[in-house]
Each structure stands twice: as C-alpha cells, then as structure tokens.
C-alpha cells in the first residue's frame, strides 16, 4: 500500500498574468508632434498598482509579467510571438485614453488568435465605453473605476475554476463589466477605492522588465532638466552642484479637479493619496 505520508498535496495553480500598456495613437500612425522613439513617458503607475495589490494579497510575483506595448511599439508578428511564447492565462490591457480603442481592437485580436482560451481584461479610461468595447472587440471583461479590488476579485474567480460559462458569478462584484448570454451589459456599479489607498513610487525594475530586449528605453522615464523650463529653476535646490541633469516625476493624486460635462472619468472627484 502506498505510504500516504509521502504524497504531496495538490496545490491550486495560479493563473499566469501579463499586464500590458497600450499606445494612445491608432495602429500605423506616428505621433504628429514628437518622435515616438525619443518622447518622454510617465510610468504607468496604474499597472504597477494592480501588480502591487495582487502581490500584497499573496499572489506570487513570479506569476505576473509586464509588456510595455506603448514603449516598444511591436509589430503584429512580434506581439503574436510574445503571447504564444509567454502563454498567459489572463492578459490585462491598460487603455489610458479613449484614443486607445483601435489599439485595443488590434492587440486583443492578436491575443485571441494566439491564445483562444485566455481571458482578455481591459482597464483604464476607455472602459467608460464598456458596452462598445465588449460588443465591438474580443475583450471578455472590463474593469471600471479603481482596478485593484475588482481585478483581484476576478483573479480569485479564475483561481477557483471560474470560466466564461460561469461568469455570471461575478454579476454582483463592483467594477466588473461583461456581456451576458443575451449580449446585454452586466454592471453592478463602480468599484470602491482600495483599502489603505496609496500611489506607489515607480518601480523602475518592473517597468524595465516590460521592455524585453530594449532595457535602455527605461531612460525615457526621466526628463532632462532643460525640458522643464523656468519653473524648475524657481526652487533654489535645483542649482545645487550635485543635482543630476534628469528629473523623475510621480503622481500624488487621483482624479481631476475639473467637472467637465463631456468627460467620462472613472475616478470620481479628486483624491490626494499617500
């Protein structure tokens, strides 16, 4: 008889996750007023915040990868090769502006072709138009509002065996949108802000990991002092001899102080965080 003491218990397998940033320009277009290969970028802290929240809730960091599509501008063939090789179970796309719609269509189609059974989840500003996104693209789920809590809830759903046939289990989860069997939008309301909300300091090693074989592009996260204009010089510390010629920027708030009637912001109001 087999000695059961020597049998290792079967542990639940964590799904592999790839988080991606998307360009705001349409496929095939160039930036009109800047060289896209040299333009300064602000780190997409929303993507990092999702990663940090998952890790803070005991999700293995090694199960999360990052692909900076916005910075790399890979071809369709390069994207397909990446996803076939990486083979994540869940791909999270970040669309910071509605301008990213055509990129969402492009990238999600490539993912669906390469990985027919994977989940494609969209977050960011574009999810204000979740009905259009879900009906006109192959995106499976939209995360509306602050994404940390609902994305974590979605991961838990997948970990316990949830499938596209049982997605109705998520109908009461705030911040999660999907289409039911009749093609109607299911949305129970905006997500709540994460507990102990904070905006992370940029993790440049994380952002560098998304640059694949072009780690030197991380330099584009640092803006030359001369590009800041006269405002920077108002601080006398800027004239200290030990100062380096580049500046890193980071966010200290969420939302916007404006109340434009035409804006579809998911983050309601203006919140200063730690």
Predicted features by range, described:
Residues 2-5, 74-77, 86, 242-243, ...:
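Conserved alpha-helical substructure of the radical SAM core
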Residues 10-16, 243-246:
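A short, charged/proline- and glycine-enriched loop
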Residues 15-40:
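Short glycine-rich His-centered loop
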Residues 24-26, 71, 127, 255, ...:
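Short, glycine/serine-rich, charged loops/turns that create anion-binding
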Residues 35-54:
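Short catalytic helix/loop segments, enriched in acidic residues and glycine
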Residues 37-39, 94-102, 266-274:
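Conserved glycine-rich "GG(E/T)P / GGGxP" loop and the immediately following alpha-helix
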Residues 42, 205-274:
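Radical SAM [4Fe-4S] cluster-binding motif and immediate context
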Residues 50-53, 62-196:
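Glycine-rich beta-alpha loop elements in corrinoid/cobalamin-binding modules
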């Amino acid at each position: 008889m087999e000695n059961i003491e020597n049998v290792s218990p079967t542990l639940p397998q964590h799904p592999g996750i790839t988080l991606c940033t998307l360009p705001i320009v349409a496929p095939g277009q160039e930036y009109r007023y800047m060289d896209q290969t040299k333009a300064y970028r602000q780190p997409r802290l929303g993507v990092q915040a999702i990663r940090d929240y998952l890790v803070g809730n005991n999700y293995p960091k090694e199960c999360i990868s990052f692909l900076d599509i916005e910075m790399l501008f890979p071809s369709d063939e390069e994207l397909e090769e990446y996803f076939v090789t990486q083979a994540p179970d869940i791909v999270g796309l970040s669309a910071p502006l509605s301008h990213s719609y055509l990129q969402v269509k492009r990238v999600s189609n490539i993912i669906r072709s390469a990985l027919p059974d994977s989940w494609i989840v969209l977050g960011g500003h574009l999810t204000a138009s979740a009905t259009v996104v879900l009906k006109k693209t192959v995106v499976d789920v939209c995360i509306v509002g602050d994404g940390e809590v609902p994305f974590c809830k979605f991961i838990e759903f997948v970990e316990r065996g949830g499938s596209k046939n049982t997605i109705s289990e998520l109908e009461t989860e705030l911040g999660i949108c999907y289409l039911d069997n009749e093609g109607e939008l299911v949305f129970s309301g905006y997500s709540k802000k994460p507990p102990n909300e904070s905006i992370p300091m940029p993790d440049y090693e994380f952002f560098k990991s998304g640059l694949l074989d072009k780690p030197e592009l991380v330099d584009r996260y640092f803006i030359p002092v001369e590009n800041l204009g006269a405002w920077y010089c108002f601080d006398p510390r800027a004239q200290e001899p030990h100062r380096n010629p580049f500046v890193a920027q980071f966010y200290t708030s969420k939302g916007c102080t404006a109340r434009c009637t035409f804006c579809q912001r998911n983050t309601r109001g203006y919140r200063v965080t730690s």
